Amino acid sequence: MTITGQINSETLNNGVPIFAPPYRWSKHWPRFTDVNCITIRYRTDGSSIRQYIPDNLQIEETPIVTIMLLDFGFSVIGPYHELIHCVEVTYEGKKYNYSFLLILDNEEACIGGRELLGNPKVLGTIEFDRQNRPPTAFIHGRVLRPSNTVIADIHFKPLCLVLDAGESKTPITGLNLRLIPSLIPGAPPSVREYTNVDFTLQGGEVWEGVGSLNFPSNSEFEPLHKFPVLEYLSATYHRGAWVEQRLLNVYSF
């Protein structure tokens, strides 16, 4: 005699393990509050990074790179820190910020971002504590992976307040490669698509200033050093903002 399980297999639509999914599908895209963020934009050497870019994307000879260091104060998956590293590309005539590497310290955010949106997220150690600052104007954070190896140092020095609460809105139009290989040798991937995701910082204070980046590690596993700084373009610090993220489109190829 056998009995069947009680979970409806035709309506399963969450992550695994199914008895405690790390995220749940919802019609409401996640929001994050009490967010602090350093954003630095710079130009890099296209010939140095083209080896990391799919051939259906185009980049300039000196493409724009955006690096963001975030302190998410609160969300449905709790507080955490994250480094976002992306490069400007063109896909089918439109410009996007192609996600190269995201490092964070929250397991649920890592799993959900990878599986749902194709974000290239990995776990790491991020030191970006708003309460523990040196007695100077500098705001500093650093990223370690593995935990004893610094791969990125980020500095920001504020110069002026440019927008007050409620007026600021900074959208980042992202493009992620969502790729799930097939288990069958020689078969095409089970999933291969680009996801177009809007990531918007809103509200709070926006400070303009001077940014400085250093990538001290030469690791081939996290090759941030292959994105050298040729020219700094801008540096800002969002304080007490909130973030909204939503899917705009999916492009299969």
Swiss-Prot record:
Keyword Lyase: yes
Entries under InterPro entries matching the protein: Acetoacetate_decarboxylase, ADC_dom_sf
Catalytic residues (positions): K121
Keyword Cell membrane: no
Pfam families for the chain: ADC
Keywords: Decarboxylase, Lyase, Schiff base
Domain of life: Eukaryota
GO molecular function, one term: carboxy-lyase activity
Pathway: Mycotoxin biosynthesis
EC numbers: 4.1.1.-
Phenotype caused by lack of the gene: Leads to the loss of T-Toxin production, resulting in low virulence for maize.
Biological role: Decarboxylase; part of the Tox1B locus, one of the 2 loci that mediate the biosynthesis of T-toxin, a family of linear polyketides 37 to 45 carbons in length, of which the major component is 41 carbons, and which leads to high virulence to maize. One of the PKSs (PKS1 or PKS2) could synthesize a precursor, used subsequently by the other PKS as starter unit, to add additional carbons.
Family the entry assigns: Belongs to the ADC family.
Record protein name field: Decarboxylase DEC1
Organism in which the protein naturally occurs: Cochliobolus heterostrophus (strain C4 / ATCC 48331 / race T)
